[in-house]
Amino acid sequence: MEAKAVARYIRLSPAKAREVVGLVRGKSVDEALAILRFTPQRAAGAVAKVIKSAAANAEHNNDMDRTRLVVAKVYVDQGPSLKRFRPRAYGRANVIKHRTSHITVIVSDGKEG
């Protein structure tokens, strides 16, 4: 059985967030949270929050045992970019794109149905 949690429009670059989610894919929920606690990247906090939410969804909605939960799938999709202008010399301007991410976590206990 599976449970899912999604965090949308997170102000993180998807490329930087994908580096962090690779560390926890396939690990147990408690092990994944322990790894993220000691990961210095800023994305680690956001990923940990989504994993906790997915585990809480599994416990509350599906009556699953938290100790048996595994991070079955975790992926990061790109959200909309916030466009800002940076003034440059001679009256020009460059576009600065602040990228956003959608983080999806699916936890499973290994049982079917």
Swiss-Prot record:
Q: Which GO terms describe its molecular function?
A: rRNA binding; structural constituent of ribosome
Q: Which GO terms describe its biological process?
A: translation
Which of UniProt's keywords are assigned here? Ribonucleoprotein, Ribosomal protein, RNA-binding, rRNA-binding
Where does the source fall among the domains of life? Bacteria
Gene Ontology cellular-component terms for this entry are: cytosolic large ribosomal subunit
Annotated InterPro entries: Ribosomal_uL22, Ribosomal_uL22_bac/chlpt-type, Ribosomal_uL22_bac/org-type, Ribosomal_uL22_CS, Ribosomal_uL22_sf
Q: How does it assemble?
A: Part of the 50S ribosomal subunit.
- Family according to the record: Belongs to the universal ribosomal protein uL22 family.
Function text: This protein binds specifically to 23S rRNA; its binding is stimulated by other ribosomal proteins, e.g. L4, L17, and L20. It is important during the early stages of 50S assembly. It makes multiple contacts with different domains of the 23S rRNA in the assembled 50S subunit and ribosome. The globular domain of the protein is located near the polypeptide exit tunnel on the outside of the subunit, while an extended beta-hairpin is found that lines the wall of the exit tunnel in the center of the 70S ribosome.
- Which protein, by its recorded name, is this? Large ribosomal subunit protein uL22
UniProt organism field: Desulforudis audaxviator (strain MP104C)
